[in-house]
UniProtKB/Swiss-Prot annotation:
This is Malate dehydrogenase. The keyword Nucleotidyltransferase does not apply. GO terms for molecular function: L-malate dehydrogenase (NAD+) activity. GO terms for biological process: tricarboxylic acid cycle. Homodimer. Its EC number is 1.1.1.37.
Length: 23
């Protein structure tokens, strides 16, 4: 989903991809 991709990009800015962990 686009929302998940956008959130993933925002999280990556923090240096941690929590969404990737959830997936």
């Amino acid at each position: 989903d686009d929302l998940f991709n956008i959130n993933a990009g925002i999280v990556k800015l923090f240096g941690v991809t929590t969404l990737d962990v959830v997936r």
